[in-house]
């Protein structure tokens, strides 16, 4: 949500809405992952992944940082998929669904960034 506070300019309103939706969805993904971990007799971490502050706040910079975040999440879900493949259909399906969502978000951000090329 920090990024959404830093957006300025004529595209502010739709981009702020988009970034807030992404933040809410990230929280939902974390809660879902925690539920899966707890359901498998694990202990979900209370740590929050650090998001590096670059102090660059143009719309292009914010969207590029968001894209990097999505691509990082995509790689983590791909690693999860490779570790659970042929071991748990349930976790495979979960990982595949998350990969699909992250790919969709990445594509949306790439399209948004085309205006800044």
Regions found by a protein language model. Give the residues of each.
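Iron-associated oxidoreductase/ferritin-like identity signal
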Residues: 1-117
